[in-house]
Amino acid sequence: MSFSWSAKDHKSYTNPPSNPTQGLKRPRNDTGNKVTVVLGAQWGDEGKGKVVDLLATESDLVCRCQGGNNAGHTVVVEGKEYDFHLLPSGIINPKSICVIGNGVVIHLPGLFEEAENNEKKGLKGWEKRLIVSDRAHLVFDFHQVVDGIQETQRQATEGKIIGTTKKGIGPTYASKASRIGLRVCDLLGDFKEFSTKFKNLVEQYQSMYSSLTVDTESQLKKLKEYGERLRPMVRDGVYYMYEALHGPPKKILVEGANAALLDIDFGTYPFVTSSNCTVGGACTGLGIPPLNIGEVYGVSKAYTTRVGIGAFPTEQLNATGELLQTRGHEVGVTTGRKRRCGWLDLVILRYAHMINGFTAIALTKLDILDVLDEIKVGMAYKINGKRIPHFPADMELLHKVEVEYETFPGWKSDTSAARKWNNLPQKAQNYIRFVESHIGVPIKWVGVGKSRECMIQMF
């Protein structure tokens, strides 16, 4: 690779010319390939995998930037359902290279088990198309045990739980932030040194959790085997992404996990995940500059769902909520827990847009609303009868908000066969246009079913 400019091209300013720019060679304004980012705009489970699957058919590179196997995507291709937790769902496309970035935390047994399960369904050649950053942190089995212990302790001391997936994600990110975590490069380096660090890490956790037992020798033996299986896939992630950005033209896609309202900084804290699920996480989790971010697509259901506990202003604890749960098959891919359901909340979507700067929205599962007589949309929050102009950081306050709704007549007809905008009932079109105008972001896709063919492209 050749560069068009370097520090040697600077001229000395010992005797500056009258025109400071005279004779100076400036760096070329060439930012390289742009990256398209797909992000959840609610509490997860919005259908990001479907949008990624749609875009991945034309993508050269599909990347994960944060989270771990706590995420869950279901993708339907030619009638087959593929479940992804850690692998980028773009791995289905035989022409795509998939990247697991440094911001992802990797449970190696889970990674290989997931790949093998999808192999049985028809996934081929994944190991030759997967790149893993050497800077990614490792999730160990004891991290998962600690995750469960912490949840039990929260229940005992506070009477409430976070609703963690118990996949060890939080403890692993805690190890990372405490600078005691272990990375892929450690595993593939001097194994004797890795073993010492691993034992020290186990001892630190055992000093905090007396009930934690770990068979270190057995674990190390397995980790060494997993490391050798992983070795051919590992690259310097920063250099790999730089080459991809500044080499020949490429379509690069970043597949966000979780969602805006689960972001460690901007979500409904503390009922959040442990990583940045917003657009900044794409930069820090892959080592790419903000200048290379191109399109940012937000994904939202035509209603709202949430797994686990935490404030949910538009939740419907009634027959409507049950109908949405049943018709939408709202069960978590990772946890198997039923999702809580409610009306679409535009306060949340506007908030997610403030943080992410969406260039377009995918509105999924419109067909689930087909049977409703009337449909409501949350427009604003009120406290003591007064509108508040922001999304509250204080969860106690969020629990107390009163939602101001706009009510629409239902279209009472089947939209699942629609493949073009004009195939949708007028009342459904009105609903979509209303949502679009009040978020201030164009809706690019409307989903009316499980498969990629059920995504109506608007422009």
Swiss-Prot record:
Note down the stretches annotated as region Disordered.
1-31
Q: What does the note accompanying the cofactor annotation read? A: Binds 1 Mg(2+) ion per subunit.
Name the SMART domains on file.
Adenylsucc_synt
* EC top class named in words: ligase
Sites where the protein binds substrate: D45, V333, T334, T335, G336, R337, K338, R339
Q: Give the HAMAP family listed for this entry.
A: Adenylosucc_synth, Adenylosucc_synth_vert_basic
Q: Which family does it belong to?
A: Belongs to the adenylosuccinate synthetase family.
Name by which UniProt lists this protein: Adenylosuccinate synthetase isozyme 1 C
Q: Which organism is it from?
A: Salmo salar (Atlantic salmon)
